[in-house]
Amino acid sequence: MKIIARNKKALFDYSIIERFEAGIVLKGSEVVALRAGRANLKDSFVRIIKNEIFLLNSHISLLHTTHSFYKHEERGARKLLMHRKQIDKLLGKVSIEGYTIVALDLYFNTKNKVKATLALAKGKNLHDKRETLKKKQADLEARAAMKNYK
């Protein structure tokens, strides 16, 4: 499993409830760009439109070798492939309980297919974010102390 892009900001801004795997509908030039590692999920989000699920605002850069006829939209909407039951479950959680769906990472699976890890998440408050930073800092200090102890 080769990870192409990771959304680190999502792990900081949201508390993850449940993770899902989804396939992505891509054009050939997009797959070539992903193989070169030219993807960014920083400001991306997932929406359900007419019972179909889309990854919006994800950035896949163009390669300079791509012919102008085959160029793709860098920030276009990309359809995600999931089972109907999973989409219905996500739709129910998002509409009723106020959760959001966030893309965590893009990767190539063992069959060289591009997959996305999605998460059902709840937004963190400012004090939750501060608490996360404090935990992270405490872990770093503990590791440093253990390293110096040896």
From Swiss-Prot:
Gene: smpB
Annotated keywords: Cytoplasm, RNA-binding
PANTHER family for the chain: SSRA-BINDING PROTEIN, TMRNA-BINDING COMPONENT OF TRANS-TRANSLATION TAGGING COMPLEX
BP-aspect Gene Ontology terms: trans-translation
One MF term in the entry's GO annotations: RNA binding
HAMAP family, per database record: SmpB (MF_00023)
UniProt cross-references to InterPro entries, sorted A to Z: SmpB, SsrA-bd_prot
Stated name of the protein: SsrA-binding protein
UniProt keyword annotation of Protein biosynthesis present: no
